[in-house]
Each structure stands twice: as structure tokens, then as C-alpha cells.
A protein has these predicted regions:
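Bacterial N-terminal signal peptides that target proteins for export
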Residues: 2-14
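Cleavable N-terminal signal peptides
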Residues: 15, 25-26
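Compact, glycine-rich, soluble single-domain proteins
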Residues: 28-155
Length: 155
């Protein structure tokens, strides 16, 4: 039996090879940066507003500077969950509503597949180094300024 490009088997194999090959490129492609603020605190956040960037997130990163993070911008407000597969850093994630108010903060351990979910429908998730929110005394109800202008970027 000859394989042609019209073969469903070959299409699946080619799609799989291309998807696997794209992961390192996505991990290396820069995400846009934005500045967020919470009272006197300033955060420089990479913006993961596309499905590809949200899938890669902070995977394979070995360090992250203080007051830096990653803001996940979701297309819909719902109960999103995060996990730590292939993520080497311990992180804390704050789930945020449409206005940028923290719904809940979850601590996440590296290279685990435990789900960490928003307590209520969330539009954003902000990942920071483990303990960052607690060290700053930030909890549910605190507003993070700057996220609301990014909602339209999600795709």
C-alpha cells in the first residue's frame, strides 16, 4: 500500500511532527510584556494571550526575576485550572475576574499535574514566584491594575 499526502495516516503523522517541532519555537518566541500594579507594587508580566503561549506558559524556565510574572489572558471568563507539567519553578497563581480582582491564590509545586482552579469564573491568571502574593499581603478581593485593558488580546 502506497502512502500519499491524501492518506489520513500520513496527515496525522505530519501534523504530529509539526506540533512537536513547534513547541521549542513557541517556548523561545518572546511574549509581549506589560506592566501591572497593585498599590505600591509593580509587576513586569509576560502576556500569554494566545492558545499556543498559554499552553507553553513558564515551562522549562529555570528562574524568574523578582516582581516578574506571566499573565494568562483567557478568551472566556470561566473556572480555569492550571497545572505544572514541565514547569521547573515553584509558583503561586492568582485567578482574577474581568476587573482584575483576585478571586483566589493557589501555590503550585514544580512538575506536578495537580489541578489548581479558580474558585469562581476567572478571565485572567497571574503566575508569580512561589509565595509572592502572601509575602505582599495580597489576597482575594485585591485589585490588580492593568489587566482589564488586555482582555481584547485573547485569542
Amino acid at each position: 500500500m502506497a502512502l500519499t499526502f491524501s492518506s489520513p495516516f500520513l496527515r496525522v503523522v505530519c501534523a504530529g511532527v509539526l506540533a512537536v517541532a513547534a513547541v521549542p519555537v513557541l517556548a523561545d518566541s518572546p511574549m509581549p510584556l506589560t506592566e501591572l500594579s497593585i498599590g505600591m507594587y509593580r509587576i513586569e508580566a509576560e502576556v500569554a494571550a494566545t492558545q499556543d503561549h498559554r499552553m507553553v506558559g513558564l515551562m522549562q524556565r529555570r528562574s524568574m526575576p523578582a516582581n516578574h510574572g506571566m499573565l494568562f489572558v483567557f478568551t472566556e471568563q470561566q473556572r480555569h485550572c492550571m497545572w505544572m507539567r514541565n514547569t521547573l519553578l515553584p509558583l503561586s497563581v492568582a485567578f482574577l475576574d474581568e476587573q482584575g480582582r483576585i478571586l483566589n491564590v493557589e501555590d503550585m509545586q514544580p512538575q506536578t499535574e495537580d489541578n489548581h482552579c479558580a474558585a469562581k469564573p476567572a478571565r485572567f491568571a497571574l503566575e508569580m514566584n512561589l509565595g509572592w502574593f502572601k509575602q505582599k499581603g495580597l489576597a482575594a478581593g485585591t485589585k490588580i491594575n492593568g489587566v482589564e485593558r488586555l482582555a481584547a488580546q485573547a485569542r
